[in-house]
Regions:
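Flexible hinge/capping segments at coil-to-helix
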Residues: 32, 132-148
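Ligand-binding clefts/hinges and TM-proximal coupling segments of bilobed small-molecule sensing domains
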Residues: 159-172, 241-275
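Periplasmic-binding protein-like
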Residues: 124-131, 194, 198-238, 260-275
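Ligand-binding cleft/hinge of the Venus flytrap
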Residues: 53-57, 70-79, 156-173, 201-205
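Short helices/loops that flank or line small-molecule/ion binding pockets
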Residues: 75-76, 84-85, 89-102, 116-118, ...
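Short helix-initiation/N-cap motifs at beta->coil->alpha
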Residues: 67, 82-93, 135, 152, ...
Length: 275
């Protein structure tokens, strides 16, 4: 009898642990259902990183490229959007702690980060580009033996030596000094991250004299961050990103923040593709 009771107790304990495990698994793996039940999605985004995310001086609301994508994702899920302001260091902790359901904050997809969180298909692609005189060649290879300015100690400087070993790479302390060298004819091109070059050119009084080549010397893909173990939510995000591309809305969002009429214009050199 004692043995029977012991067996029943063990079975009850096993059933209890199994039920607890299933409940935990369901809670962890059903974030999409939780979002829809709460009718709100919490999205971590920047509040001081234009044009991706910043506070509008007039409305005091968050605006930007990332914000527009966050709005589109919320609309596709049929829920309200709650923006959670963040900085680079806090993006992943906010997601892991449950204070944010998604990261839409200019976060580059890297192998190290992919071990911690899942990423959507890229919705923005950036990388190292060339700023050259308006009359210069339109391809990177046109500058394979040129004098090229780069910022000292950057990965861009290293990439130039690898890609164009016959080029003469001149290093500068910052990108404004490199632009001055380009203006003076000391170099035939300068290189830096595409968004930085776009901002630099946008503020230049003589911007008509220069152009940014659309081809990327290096490539960095930006994706939406999703907590590990949420395949349904990840699929919903990917499906909407691809739908935005097919409808043309993704290109419209891009043009609103990086198009010809913006302060930091740069050509769109990518499309959002199914993962």
């Amino acid at each position: 009898m004692a043995k029977t009771k012991q067996t029943l107790t063990q079975l009850a304990l096993l059933v209890g642990l199994t039920a607890t495990g299933l409940a935990t698994f369901t809670a962890q793996a059903d974030k999409l259902a939780h979002i829809k039940a709460k009718a709100v999605v919490k999205v971590a985004t920047f509040d001081a990183n234009p044009p991706f995310g910043s506070v509008d001086a007039k409305t005091h609301e968050l605006v930007g490229y990332d914000v527009d994508f966050a709005k589109a994702l919320a609309k596709s899920l049929g829920v309200k959007l709650e923006l959670v302001a963040t900085n680079p260091a806090n993006r992943i902790p906010l997601l892991q702690s449950g204070k944010a359901d998604l990261i839409v904050a200019d976060i580059t997809i890297t192998p190290a980060r992919a071990q911690v969180i899942d990423f959507s298909t890229p919705y923005f692609v950036t990388g190292q580009q060339f700023l050259v005189p308006a009359s210069g060649g339109d391809k990177l290879d046109d500058y394979s033996k040129a004098r090229i300015g780069a910022v000292k100690g950057t990965t861009g400087e290293q990439t130039l030596h690898q890609r164009f070993p016959q080029a003469r790479v001149l290093s500068y302390d910052d990108i404004p000094l490199a632009l001055t060298a380009l203006r003076n004819g000391n170099v035939q091109a300068i290189t830096q991250d595409s968004t930085i070059l776009a901002g630099l050119l946008g503020e230049a009084p003589d911007k008509a004299k220069f152009k940014i080549l659309p081809e990327l010397l290096s490539k960095e893909e930006i994706g939406v961050g999703v907590k590990k173990g949420e395949p349904a939510l990840l699929k919903a995000v990917n499906d909407e990103l691809v739908a935005l591309e097919k409808s043309g809305d993704a290109a419209k969002i891009y043009d609103a923040w990086f198009g010809p009429s913006t302060k930091a214009p740069q050509p769109r050199s990518f499309t959002i593709e199914a993962k």
